[in-house]
Amino acid sequence: MSSEKNYLNENYKSFFDDSLSVTDPELHKAISDELKRQQQHIELIASENIVSQAVLEAQGSVLTNKYAEGYPGKRYYNGCEHVDVAENLAIERLKKIFDCKFANAQPHSGAQANGAVFLALLNPGDTFMGMSLNSGGHITHGLKISMSGKWFNPIGYDVDKESELIDYDNVEKLALEHKPKLIICGGSAYSRVIDFKRFREIADKVGAYLMVDMAHFSGLVAGKGYPNPCEHAHVVTSTTHKVFRSARGGIILTNHEDLAKKFNTAVFPGYQGGPLMHVIAGKAAGFLEALRPDFKDYIKSVLANAKILSETLKNNGFKIYSGGTDTHLMLVDLRPFNVKGNAAAESLSNANITCNKNGIPFDSEKPMITSGIRLGTQAATTRGFGLKEFEKVGELITKVVKGLSENPEDNGKIEEEVRNEVIDLTSNFPIYKNLK
């Protein structure tokens, strides 16, 4: 007798056999439309990337069915022997990539990784220091409306107004004055190499923990294009999907066994419940890619492409904050063109170039308006763009912003011209040809 005869009704069979296009055409169309957008747009958002087919497969696997509270070998549920393999692969690959002794791959996001560190090391009301959002920090580094700003006492440090770089002497002065329990370095819109050794010296002077949030540059570290903060920090957190180019999520790294135990407990059961095992599998797949020699080549290209894009824009009259970039990202000040960040980002999006509005340090504009845009080269580098293409991208951005400056009420003609050029350019660097 066929096993299919045992279904109580045909709906059970279709539940396991029918594709999304059959069961939910509306959702399938939204996903298909997003695929087309990614294929035909130049992605310059500094926090996004394009993952491999392998990462997509791992994250879309049957591991989504498995609950696995706890850690490998110490689960609260049975049947975890195979997901244990996936998580152990993620952990061991992280340790190898970043040359660290302990790793936690369970945080659902970078924000939750940061929250778990706060839970492990701080008590409500404790003082900590982080780069202010206005200078390129992150909302989890002390923004008043965030958990870190509500539960703790954040002290923000800013970049120097003249050099537009971190003022380490001022950081030390603030640390000596406020005696923080934790000092955070790293941010979401700071494009220069950070002196981790100096930060550790400052932390040691006041008896503080040093935490590095390397969400934006962990991929650069993995590809040997940026100093490794694990050599100096008590704890390092990161996302896994930006330049790192793995499945979307967070990680926590440390070289201290006593702290590792605290972080594990803070993640589970302190801050999260069951880990997302399909996501951890996707992370593991991406981590293996980061261990391969061609990942270093990718990082070299990301950095070289950022330099050429930055220089092209500077030569065309834009101001690049801090004068350039040491990373994948750059903060572009639009005030020389009398254009606001929100208007530029919208017009560029209409032209199939995707970026985000971003405040510049000490910006007088509101957060939803801004005086700048933030650009990153990692996603377009992943699809194969090189120096020639990024020089072209710089010219296309210039064309759109200049058009907007000259005709702020209607930049449609320029947007259409650039959009056609972008579609032609991206067609030479196809992605996900077998997806529908």
UniProtKB/Swiss-Prot annotation:
Q: Where is this protein primarily located?
A: cytoplasm
Residues with PTM N6-(pyridoxal phosphate)lysine: 242
Task: Give the matching SUPFAM superfamilies.
Answer: PLP-dependent transferases (SSF53383)
CDD domains reported in the protein's UniProt record: SHMT
* Swiss-Prot/TrEMBL site (Plays an important role in substrate specificity) positions: 241
Q: Which residues form the signal peptide?
A: none
Q: What are the names of the required cofactors? A: pyridoxal 5'-phosphate
Q: Which reactions appear under catalytic activity for this entry?
A: (6R)-5,10-methylene-5,6,7,8-tetrahydrofolate + glycine + H2O = (6S)-5,6,7,8-tetrahydrofolate + L-serine
Q: Name one GO cellular component term.
A: cytosol
In this chain, (6S)-5,6,7,8-tetrahydrofolate is annotated as bound at: 133, 137-139
Per the UniProt entry, the Enzyme Commission number(s) are 2.1.2.1
Please name the top-level EC class of this enzyme: transferase
Pathway field of the UniProt record reads: One-carbon metabolism; tetrahydrofolate interconversion; Amino-acid biosynthesis; glycine biosynthesis; glycine from L-serine: step 1/1
- Which BP terms from GO are recorded? glycine biosynthetic process from serine; tetrahydrofolate interconversion
Which is one GO molecular function term here? pyridoxal phosphate binding
What UniProt keywords are attached to this protein's entry?
Answer: Amino-acid biosynthesis, Cytoplasm, One-carbon metabolism, Pyridoxal phosphate, Transferase
Q: Does the keyword Endoplasmic reticulum apply?
A: no
**Annotated compartments:** Cytoplasm
Q: Does the keyword Amino-acid biosynthesis apply?
A: yes
Q: Which family does it belong to?
A: Belongs to the SHMT family.
Quaternary structure and partners: Homodimer.
The job of this chain, per UniProt, is described as: Catalyzes the reversible interconversion of serine and glycine with tetrahydrofolate (THF) serving as the one-carbon carrier. This reaction serves as the major source of one-carbon groups required for the biosynthesis of purines, thymidylate, methionine, and other important biomolecules. Also exhibits THF-independent aldolase activity toward beta-hydroxyamino acids, producing glycine and aldehydes, via a retro-aldol mechanism.
Q: What is this protein called?
A: Serine hydroxymethyltransferase
Q: Identify the taxonomic lineage of the organism of origin.
A: Bacteria, Pseudomonadati, Pseudomonadota, Alphaproteobacteria, Candidatus Pelagibacterales
